[in-house]
């Protein structure tokens, strides 16, 4: 993922997670072999990094320690995180810094669009920090970024991964009206974990948001993702799948939670590849058009390839219904 520049001059001395400093250190479990990946060293990785830096962008891939950064950047795949690198919320799983955000960078939409064009992206993912400080939660900024990409690189398909726009009337409607190709909003975890893992959010608000997207534009692909290994029970994951299908969500991603620091929520369990495969099988039986379920699955991992498969799955379903 990628975010815009940090205006904090003394970044090296900034306390990244002041809201978590009071927490006791948690146990860090040793990662199993199926989680480990090679360090990024390829030429493609270096070229992607150079492009990102040349447009005054900062990578949340690096900050979050995403395990897929080497693979994605080698292929010049990127997710741009807009509206700064400081979030107004403090989720227990997230490595993005929390605090008082800077003013929006009004040049960001054009800068992101330039990077998309220079990298030759056929599919791009745009995400953001939560901006509860903004009247519209950043909806207009999402809109401007989408429009800028459409102008600079008309052939690029656009996937957005949005915050929940909690208590921001009209924000969702504005973003949907900008016509992204895929609307993604992650539930992150099962509802019983929300108070400890995602305290600033509301589970059923997120479900309703995804449902509302389909009401506004029935043709728009919708997507959501969760992490497992946070202490959830299997039956809770299956119920979450049912909730998403009630909202007519097309695409589900399930990946292993990895603990950023000792101050973050601990990994309760490393879910095995066989368990991930089982979740995938069940999810397909519940009617999802696409499911990606594996230890290293992340919302934007293989997003371009998955979008092509998602379109093909819908076409196949429509043809079957017409017979």
Curated annotation (Swiss-Prot):
Note describing how the cofactor binds: Binds 2 [4Fe-4S] clusters per subunit. One cluster is coordinated with 3 cysteines and an exchangeable S-adenosyl-L-methionine.
Name of the protein described by the UniProt record: Lipoyl synthase
Lineage: Bacteria, Pseudomonadati, Pseudomonadota, Alphaproteobacteria, Hyphomicrobiales
PROSITE patterns: RADICAL_SAM
Binding site residues for [4Fe-4S] cluster 1: 61, 66, 72, 300
Localisation: Cytoplasm
Cellular component GO terms, alphabetical: cytoplasm
InterPro entries in UniProt: Aldolase_TIM (IPR013785), Elp3/MiaA/NifB-like_rSAM (IPR006638), LIAS_N (IPR031691), Lipoyl_synth (IPR003698), rSAM (IPR007197)
EC number: 2.8.1.8
Family: Belongs to the radical SAM superfamily. Lipoyl synthase family.
Pathway listed: Protein modification; protein lipoylation via endogenous pathway; protein N(6)-(lipoyl)lysine from octanoyl-[acyl-carrier-protein]: step 2/2
Binding site for [4Fe-4S] cluster 2: 87, 91, 94
Molecular-function GO terms, alphabetical: 4 iron, 4 sulfur cluster binding; lipoate synthase activity; metal ion binding
Ranges for domain Radical SAM core: 73-289
Originating species: Sinorhizobium medicae (strain WSM419) (Ensifer medicae)
The keyword Transferase is annotated on this UniProt entry: yes
Catalyzed chemical reaction(s): [[Fe-S] cluster scaffold protein carrying a second [4Fe-4S](2+) cluster] + N(6)-octanoyl-L-lysyl-[protein] + 2 oxidized [2Fe-2S]-[ferredoxin] + 2 S-adenosyl-L-methionine + 4 H(+) = [[Fe-S] cluster scaffold protein] + N(6)-[(R)-dihydrolipoyl]-L-lysyl-[protein] + 4 Fe(3+) + 2 hydrogen sulfide + 2 5'-deoxyadenosine + 2 L-methionine + 2 reduced [2Fe-2S]-[ferredoxin]
